[in-house]
């Protein structure tokens, strides 16, 4: 009985499989036919759209103004060059407008196309007013996107890298802030033909990727948008402006310039604590610190454009240079008023000893001559010879030697100028630093936003 049931089940499964397989094949063929039909439909739609389409003429020519809605997505911002006053930015530049000639009806509401279709239709002739160099990426294919909605609305996106000018005012350098503009608009069409409009508000029309900053010396706190109209000999044109706000980081310059300047000034003031007679040591301190400040001032200017005004760092270096040079002038003044005298107060004792030794030598020489003259008579008379041998040789009267006075080294007293400088110089330098840093660090950054 069980055998009969199993065989019937197997027959049923085989029947279902044989019945389903043709149905599956039929369904696959239907889907394939639908795909082919869709491709055929879209091909016909595109052919119909381009049939009689003149991409030399803007939409609404003679009837209305073409409105181009724009927004920017920044994928990479930086680097910023202070010497050239320019910056580099990598963006997805998006433009949207409506072309009544490209309306269509089909199974889909949006046609997603690539750059090949973009070259066959009218697109805005947008260019960057302050761009020095612009590159449209073409690897591995041109990085362009085109979408056409059924109502004729087009979305055109390009990936661009732009080197743009960034005017900088460096009076507060390195505590400065800047606003780098990105200006763009139509090259040929005036405001009566084509106008540009930001798609969203300020925070959404220009967006920066979270990891898009490529800045070592700046922070990018935010951005803003604007719009203006400029006049030229050929008409009025709409100019869209996106401002990128930059705030410089001061840490690098504190380590590279400010701390060495402060340490050099402190080193120059060490000479006030040396004796006024230490001319070589104090000269080395003065000359070395002056040369060090000169080197620091030159190196600080190498990273800046050759502007005709003084920056905040220039003022700091100039004041430090004045302190160092004043320390050298102070030593010259002290040295000029230093009294000149013998270095040892035992000189008179030394001279007396030399005179005493000279008189003893003269007496000894006289006695030796007298003995030599009397010697022949002594040899003739044996009695006198015996007496002379037994006689003691007279010695000159010597004064008891007094212990020479101890030679003590004498110094001039500490100069009043040095005493005053030990207090005045540090106090003045500390006051200057307090005023300088309080002024610049508490100052609100002024962003030079161009209209």
From Swiss-Prot:
<comment type="subunit">
    <text>Heteropentamer, formed by a combination of alpha (GABRA1-6), beta (GABRB1-3), gamma (GABRG1-3), delta (GABRD), epsilon (GABRE), rho (GABRR1-3), pi (GABRP) and theta (GABRQ) subunits, each subunit exhibiting distinct physiological and pharmacological properties. Interacts with UBQLN1. Interacts with KIF21B. Interacts with LHFPL4. Interacts with SHISA7; interaction leads to the regulation of GABA(A) receptor trafficking, channel deactivation kinetics and pharmacology.</text>
</comment>
<dbReference type="InterPro" id="IPR036734">
    <property type="entry name" value="Neur_chan_lig-bd_sf"/>
</dbReference>
<feature type="topological domain" description="Extracellular">
    <location>
        <begin position="442"/>
        <end position="451"/>
    </location>
</feature>
<feature type="glycosylation site" description="N-linked (GlcNAc...) asparagine">
    <location>
        <position position="138"/>
    </location>
</feature>
<feature type="transmembrane region" description="Helical">
    <location>
        <begin position="281"/>
        <end position="300"/>
    </location>
</feature>
<keyword id="KW-0966">Cell projection</keyword>
<keyword id="KW-0472">Membrane</keyword>
<dbReference type="InterPro" id="IPR006202">
    <property type="entry name" value="Neur_chan_lig-bd"/>
</dbReference>
<dbReference type="InterPro" id="IPR047023">
    <property type="entry name" value="Gabra-2_ECD"/>
</dbReference>
<feature type="glycosylation site" description="N-linked (GlcNAc...) asparagine">
    <location>
        <position position="38"/>
    </location>
</feature>
<keyword id="KW-0968">Cytoplasmic vesicle</keyword>
<dbReference type="InterPro" id="IPR018000">
    <property type="entry name" value="Neurotransmitter_ion_chnl_CS"/>
</dbReference>
<keyword id="KW-1071">Ligand-gated ion channel</keyword>
<keyword id="KW-1003">Cell membrane</keyword>
<keyword id="KW-0732">Signal</keyword>
<dbReference type="GO" id="GO:0051932">
    <property type="term" value="P:synaptic transmission, GABAergic"/>
</dbReference>
<comment type="similarity">
    <text>Belongs to the ligand-gated ion channel (TC 1.A.9) family. Gamma-aminobutyric acid receptor (TC 1.A.9.5) subfamily. GABRA2 sub-subfamily.</text>
</comment>
<dbReference type="InterPro" id="IPR006028">
    <property type="entry name" value="GABAA/Glycine_rcpt"/>
</dbReference>
<keyword id="KW-0812">Transmembrane</keyword>
<dbReference type="GO" id="GO:0098794">
    <property type="term" value="C:postsynapse"/>
</dbReference>
<dbReference type="GO" id="GO:0034707">
    <property type="term" value="C:chloride channel complex"/>
</dbReference>
<feature type="transmembrane region" description="Helical">
    <location>
        <begin position="250"/>
        <end position="270"/>
    </location>
</feature>
<dbReference type="InterPro" id="IPR006201">
    <property type="entry name" value="Neur_channel"/>
</dbReference>
<keyword id="KW-0868">Chloride</keyword>
<feature type="transmembrane region" description="Helical">
    <location>
        <begin position="421"/>
        <end position="441"/>
    </location>
</feature>
<feature type="topological domain" description="Extracellular">
    <location>
        <begin position="301"/>
        <end position="311"/>
    </location>
</feature>
<keyword id="KW-0813">Transport</keyword>
<keyword id="KW-0407">Ion channel</keyword>
<dbReference type="InterPro" id="IPR006029">
    <property type="entry name" value="Neurotrans-gated_channel_TM"/>
</dbReference>
<dbReference type="GO" id="GO:0004890">
    <property type="term" value="F:GABA-A receptor activity"/>
</dbReference>
<protein>
    <recommendedName>
        <fullName>Gamma-aminobutyric acid receptor subunit alpha-2</fullName>
    </recommendedName>
</protein>
<keyword id="KW-0770">Synapse</keyword>
<dbReference type="GO" id="GO:0045211">
    <property type="term" value="C:postsynaptic membrane"/>
</dbReference>
<dbReference type="Pfam" id="PF02931">
    <property type="entry name" value="Neur_chan_LBD"/>
</dbReference>
<dbReference type="GO" id="GO:0032590">
    <property type="term" value="C:dendrite membrane"/>
</dbReference>
<dbReference type="InterPro" id="IPR047024">
    <property type="entry name" value="Gabra-1-6_TM"/>
</dbReference>
<dbReference type="Pfam" id="PF02932">
    <property type="entry name" value="Neur_chan_memb"/>
</dbReference>
<feature type="glycosylation site" description="N-linked (GlcNAc...) asparagine">
    <location>
        <position position="201"/>
    </location>
</feature>
<dbReference type="InterPro" id="IPR038050">
    <property type="entry name" value="Neuro_actylchol_rec"/>
</dbReference>
<keyword id="KW-0675">Receptor</keyword>
<feature type="binding site">
    <location>
        <position position="94"/>
    </location>
    <ligand>
        <name>4-aminobutanoate</name>
    </ligand>
</feature>
<feature type="topological domain" description="Cytoplasmic">
    <location>
        <begin position="271"/>
        <end position="280"/>
    </location>
</feature>
């Amino acid at each position: 009985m069980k055998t009969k049931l199993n065989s019937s089940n197997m027959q049923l499964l085989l029947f279902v499989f044989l019945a389903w397989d043709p149905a599956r094949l039929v369904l696959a063929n239907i889907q394939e036919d639908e795909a082919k039909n869709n491709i055929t439909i879209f091909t016909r739609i595109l052919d119909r759209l381009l049939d009689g389409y003149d991409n030399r003429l803007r939409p609404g020519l003679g009837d209305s103004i073409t409105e181009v809605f724009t927004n920017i997505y920044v994928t990479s911002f930086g680097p910023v060059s202070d010497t050239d006053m320019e910056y580099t930015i990598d963006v997805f530049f998006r433009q949207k407008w409506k072309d009544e000639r490209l309306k269509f009806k089909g199974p889909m509401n949006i046609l997603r196309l690539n750059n090949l279709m973009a070259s066959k239709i009218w697109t805005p002739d947008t260019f960057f007013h302050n761009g020095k160099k612009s590159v449209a990426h073409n690897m591995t294919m041109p990085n362009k996107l085109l979408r056409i909605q059924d109502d004729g609305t087009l979305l055109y996106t390009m990936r661009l890298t732009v080197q743009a000018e960034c005017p900088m005012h460096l009076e507060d350098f390195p505590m400065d802030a800047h606003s780098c503009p990105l200006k763009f608009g139509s090259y040929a069409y005036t405001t009566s033909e084509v106008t540009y409009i930001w798609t969203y508000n300020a925070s959404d029309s220009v967006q920066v990727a979270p990891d898009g900053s490529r800045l070592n010396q700046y922070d990018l706190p935010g951005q803003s948008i604007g719009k203006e109209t400029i006049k030229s000999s050929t008409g009025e044109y709409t100019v869209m402006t996106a401002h990128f706000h930059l705030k410089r980081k001061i840490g690098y310059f504190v380590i590279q310039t400010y701390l060495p300047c402060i340490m050099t000034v402190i080193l120059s003031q060490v000479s006030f604590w040396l004796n006024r007679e230490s001319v070589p040591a104090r000269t080395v301190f003065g000359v070395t610190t002056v040369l060090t400040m000169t080197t620091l001032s030159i190196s600080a200017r190498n990273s800046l454009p050759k502007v005709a005004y003084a920056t905040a760092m220039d003022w700091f270096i100039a004041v430090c240079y004045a302190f160092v040079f004043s320390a050298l002038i102070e030593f010259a003044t002290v040295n000029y008023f230093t009294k000149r005298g013998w270095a040892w107060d035992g000189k008179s004792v030394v001279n007396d000893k030399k005179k005493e030794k000279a008189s003893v030598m003269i007496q000894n020489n006289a006695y030796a001559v007298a003995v030599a003259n009397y010697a022949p008579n002594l040899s003739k008379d044996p009695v006198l010879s015996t007496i002379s041998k037994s006689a003691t040789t007279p010695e000159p009267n010597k004064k008891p030697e007094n212990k020479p006075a101890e030679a003590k080294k004498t110094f001039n007293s500490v100069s009043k100028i040095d005493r005053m400088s030990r207090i005045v110089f540090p106090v003045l330098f500390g006051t200057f630093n307090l005023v300088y840093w309080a002024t610049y660090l508490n100052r609100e950054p002024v962003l030079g936003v161009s209209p």
